[in-house]
Amino acid sequence: MTIFSKIIAGEIPSYKIAENEKFFAFLDIFPLREGHVLVVPKTETDKFFDLPDEFLSEMLLFAKPIAKAIERSFNCNRCGVEVVGLEVPHAHMHLIPINSANDLNFTKDKLKMTPEQMKKVQETIVGNL
Protein backbone atom coordinates (compact mmCIF):
# COMPACT_ATOMS: atom_id res chain seq x y z
CA MET A 1 0.00 0.00 0.00
CA THR A 2 1.48 3.38 -1.01
CA ILE A 3 1.53 6.47 1.16
CA PHE A 4 -1.15 7.93 -1.14
CA SER A 5 -3.40 4.90 -0.57
CA LYS A 6 -2.94 5.38 3.18
CA ILE A 7 -3.90 9.06 2.82
CA ILE A 8 -6.99 8.15 0.78
CA ALA A 9 -7.96 5.52 3.39
CA GLY A 10 -7.61 8.10 6.17
CA GLU A 11 -4.72 6.25 7.82
CA ILE A 12 -2.50 9.30 7.32
CA PRO A 13 -4.00 12.78 7.79
CA SER A 14 -4.10 15.17 4.84
CA TYR A 15 -5.37 18.57 3.82
CA LYS A 16 -8.13 17.36 1.51
CA ILE A 17 -9.24 19.63 -1.30
CA ALA A 18 -11.75 17.42 -3.14
CA GLU A 19 -12.83 13.80 -3.53
CA ASN A 20 -15.15 11.68 -5.62
CA GLU A 21 -15.57 7.94 -6.15
CA LYS A 22 -12.40 7.69 -8.30
CA PHE A 23 -10.06 10.52 -7.29
CA PHE A 24 -8.68 12.33 -4.26
CA ALA A 25 -6.99 15.76 -4.20
CA PHE A 26 -4.95 17.09 -1.29
CA LEU A 27 -2.20 19.58 -0.51
CA ASP A 28 1.37 18.46 -1.10
CA ILE A 29 3.08 18.62 2.31
CA PHE A 30 6.37 19.43 0.53
CA PRO A 31 5.06 22.13 -1.82
CA LEU A 32 7.03 23.92 -4.51
CA ARG A 33 4.68 26.87 -4.03
CA GLU A 34 1.81 27.75 -1.75
CA GLY A 35 -1.27 26.05 -3.22
CA HIS A 36 0.53 22.97 -4.60
CA VAL A 37 -2.09 20.19 -4.87
CA LEU A 38 -1.75 16.49 -5.70
CA VAL A 39 -4.51 14.72 -7.64
CA VAL A 40 -4.45 10.96 -7.14
CA PRO A 41 -6.60 8.12 -8.47
CA LYS A 42 -7.98 5.90 -5.74
CA THR A 43 -6.91 2.91 -7.82
CA GLU A 44 -3.29 2.20 -6.94
CA THR A 45 -1.39 2.21 -10.25
CA ASP A 46 2.34 2.96 -10.41
CA LYS A 47 2.70 4.69 -13.78
CA PHE A 48 0.41 7.47 -14.97
CA PHE A 49 0.01 6.10 -18.49
CA ASP A 50 -0.83 2.63 -17.15
CA LEU A 51 -4.12 4.05 -15.87
CA PRO A 52 -7.20 3.01 -17.88
CA ASP A 53 -7.94 5.46 -20.70
CA GLU A 54 -11.19 6.65 -19.13
CA PHE A 55 -9.32 7.50 -15.92
CA LEU A 56 -6.97 9.83 -17.78
CA SER A 57 -9.78 11.99 -19.16
CA GLU A 58 -11.84 11.78 -15.97
CA MET A 59 -8.81 12.76 -13.89
CA LEU A 60 -8.33 15.93 -15.93
CA LEU A 61 -12.02 16.77 -15.61
CA PHE A 62 -11.80 16.21 -11.84
CA ALA A 63 -8.69 18.42 -11.66
CA LYS A 64 -10.07 21.28 -13.76
CA PRO A 65 -12.23 23.01 -11.10
CA ILE A 66 -9.40 22.58 -8.58
CA ALA A 67 -6.96 24.23 -11.00
CA LYS A 68 -9.41 27.10 -11.50
CA ALA A 69 -9.78 27.45 -7.71
CA ILE A 70 -5.98 27.57 -7.37
CA GLU A 71 -5.84 30.35 -9.97
CA ARG A 72 -8.50 32.31 -8.06
CA SER A 73 -6.74 31.71 -4.74
CA PHE A 74 -3.15 32.74 -5.49
CA ASN A 75 -1.28 35.43 -7.38
CA CYS A 76 -0.28 33.41 -10.45
CA ASN A 77 -0.49 33.53 -14.23
CA ARG A 78 -1.91 30.02 -14.41
CA CYS A 79 -2.11 26.64 -12.72
CA GLY A 80 0.67 24.42 -14.03
CA VAL A 81 0.22 20.67 -14.40
CA GLU A 82 3.11 18.28 -13.91
CA VAL A 83 3.26 14.49 -14.05
CA VAL A 84 6.56 13.18 -12.70
CA GLY A 85 5.94 10.04 -10.66
CA LEU A 86 9.43 9.27 -9.41
CA GLU A 87 9.03 9.58 -5.65
CA VAL A 88 5.80 7.68 -4.97
CA PRO A 89 4.83 4.55 -6.97
CA HIS A 90 1.22 5.73 -7.32
CA ALA A 91 0.13 7.68 -10.40
CA HIS A 92 -0.58 11.33 -9.64
CA MET A 93 -0.49 14.83 -11.05
CA HIS A 94 0.72 18.06 -9.49
CA LEU A 95 -1.34 21.25 -9.77
CA ILE A 96 0.90 24.22 -9.00
CA PRO A 97 0.23 27.96 -9.19
CA ILE A 98 2.93 29.31 -11.51
CA ASN A 99 4.22 32.52 -13.01
CA SER A 100 7.14 31.00 -14.93
CA ALA A 101 8.56 27.60 -15.89
CA ASN A 102 11.01 27.93 -12.99
CA ASP A 103 8.07 27.53 -10.59
CA LEU A 104 7.86 23.87 -11.76
CA ASN A 105 11.50 23.12 -10.88
CA PHE A 106 11.36 20.09 -8.59
CA THR A 107 15.08 20.39 -7.75
CA LYS A 108 14.41 23.63 -5.83
CA ASP A 109 14.03 23.60 -2.06
CA LYS A 110 10.47 22.92 -0.99
CA LEU A 111 8.50 25.37 1.12
CA LYS A 112 8.32 24.73 4.84
CA MET A 113 4.80 25.51 6.00
CA THR A 114 3.25 25.24 9.43
CA PRO A 115 0.05 23.23 9.95
CA GLU A 116 -1.76 26.55 10.40
CA GLN A 117 -0.48 27.82 7.05
CA MET A 118 -1.46 24.56 5.35
CA LYS A 119 -4.97 24.75 6.84
CA LYS A 120 -5.35 28.33 5.59
CA VAL A 121 -4.27 27.32 2.07
CA GLN A 122 -6.71 24.38 2.17
CA GLU A 123 -9.58 26.63 3.27
CA THR A 124 -8.74 29.20 0.60
CA ILE A 125 -8.73 26.69 -2.26
CA VAL A 126 -11.84 24.86 -1.03
CA GLY A 127 -13.58 28.22 -0.61
CA ASN A 128 -12.89 29.00 -4.27
CA LEU A 129 -14.16 25.68 -5.65
Where are these regions (language model features)?
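HIT superfamily nucleotide-processing domains
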Residues: 1-129
